[in-house]
Curated annotation (Swiss-Prot):
Source organism: Pseudomonas fluorescens (strain SBW25)
EC number: 2.1.3.2
GO CC terms in record: cytosol
First-tier enzyme category under EC: transferase
NCBIfam families tied to this protein: asp_carb_tr (TIGR00670), PRK00856.1 (NF002032)
Gene expressing this chain: pyrB
Protein's UniProt name: Aspartate carbamoyltransferase catalytic subunit
One Gene Ontology term from the biological process aspect of the record: 'de novo' UMP biosynthetic process
Keywords from the UniProt entry: Pyrimidine biosynthesis, Transferase
InterPro entries the record matches: Asp/Orn_carbamoyltranf_P-bd, Asp/Orn_carbamoylTrfase, Asp/Orn_carbamoylTrfase_sf, Asp_carbamoyltransf, Asp_carbamoyltransf_Asp/Orn-bd
Pfam family, one: OTCace_N
Any one GO molecular function term: amino acid binding
Family per similarity comment: Belongs to the aspartate/ornithine carbamoyltransferase superfamily. ATCase family.
Pathway membership: Pyrimidine metabolism; UMP biosynthesis via de novo pathway; (S)-dihydroorotate from bicarbonate: step 2/3
Residues annotated as binding carbamoyl phosphate: R71, T72, R121, H151, Q154, G280, P281
Lineage of source species: Bacteria, Pseudomonadati, Pseudomonadota, Gammaproteobacteria, Pseudomonadales
């Protein structure tokens, strides 16, 4: 585990409100619950004839993605548009960054265009924290995923999915399965589940895909699928991240599927009403059988729907927190 997983007070303003969203580590249960409650209230916007509310009218949100993304980028764009914000999405492959401009130079140029918020995805762990510490303080920073470190909005949309299907975290058993070592989603989910009071958090993976020190998250570690899935309420499958792997961690994808793929037979060991989740993109026949991904227990497409509402909640709350912080600073400067 990384020293980046320490409490980061710069996420909160002087009143304890969200002003950046960088990691779930150190955020109180009350704040995570507020995000879930706010997201719940935004779900009905997607069913309207006009799918908009005016909360961020006049604000400019820049999506700056240094890594490829489909679901995260698109749902952030939709979330901002449904809040009536103006949205700029930077294609890094055609931007000055691909010509040698530094990360901070790119963002400071966007900042000079009076952007109010950056949603940043970057391959380096800690990039979002670095940006929040170095750009103009009145610009809110939302972490869209940084290296292996964190993917906090994915963590929260997974929590909303679980809460809407299971009602409460208090008596749940949740299994997170697959490439734990390289997964920022796994880290965010473990933190969120622990904070929200889930008593039984399990990780299931080959020993080569388990990070050193994972026990600090308060999880039970399994290297056998049948044992780890026994009587669980929720199964969260993870993508096998070949692009982040060095050689020798796995014999083959086929061998991984044979031992750790979620099949109908293996899912039968979980509770009969267990739900199956996956952050996407899915590798069918590697992490999960198509019959399971498309089956009645799968809530994978629900996750995408809930992701828009969660990102609406985070964008609106962080913008509100930034405004409150500026007012606080102005009042105390007088």
């Amino acid at each position: 585990m990384t020293p980046l997983d320490a409490k980061r007070p710069l996420q909160l303003n002087a009143q304890g409100q969200l002003q950046h969203f960088l990691s779930l580590d150190g955020l109180p249960r009350e704040l995570l619950t507020e995000i879930l409650d706010t997201a719940d209230s935004f779900l009905e916007v997607g069913g309207r004839a006009v799918k908009k509310v005016p909360l961020l009218r006049g604000k400019t949100i820049c999506n700056v993605f240094f890594e490829n993304s489909t679901r995260t980028r698109t749902t952030f764009e939709l979330a901002a548009q449904r809040l009536s914000a103006d949205v700029i999405t930077l294609n890094v492959s055609t931007s000055s960054a691909s010509k040698g401009e530094t990360l901070l130079d790119t963002l400071r140029n966007l900042e000079a265009m009076a952007a109010d918020m950056f949603v940043v995805r970057h391959g380096d762990s800690g990039a979002a924290h670095f940006i929040a510490e170095h750009v103009c303080p009145q610009v809110a920073i939302i972490n869209g995923g940084d290296g292996r470190h964190a993917h906090p909005t994915q963590g929260m949309l997974d929590m909303l999915t679980i809460r809407r299907h299971k009602g409460s975290f208090e008596n749940l058993s949740v299994a997170i399965v697959g490439d734990i070592l390289h997964s920022r989603v796994a880290r965010s989910n473990m933190l969120a589940l622990k904070t929200l009071g889930c008593p039984d958090i399990r990780v299931i993976a080959p020993k080569t895909l388990l990070p050193i020190g994972i026990e600090q998250y308060g999880v039970k570690v399994y290297t056998d699928m049948a044992e780890g899935l026994k009587d669980v309420d929720v199964v969260i499958m993870l993508r096998l991240q070949r692009e982040r792997m060095s050689g020798g961690l796995l014999p083959s994808e086929g061998e991984f599927y044979r031992l750790f793929g979620l099949t109908t037979a293996r899912l039968a060991g979980a509770k009969p009403d267990a739900i199956v989740m996956h952050p996407g993109p899915i590798n069918r026949g590697v992490e999960i059988e198509s019959a399971v991904a498309d089956g009645n227990q799968s809530v994978i497409l629900n996750q995408v729907t809930y992701g828009i509402a969660v990102r609406m909640a985070v964008l609106s709350m962080a913008m509100s927190g930034q405004t409150a912080q500026r007012q606080f600073e102005q009042e105390n400067a007088q």
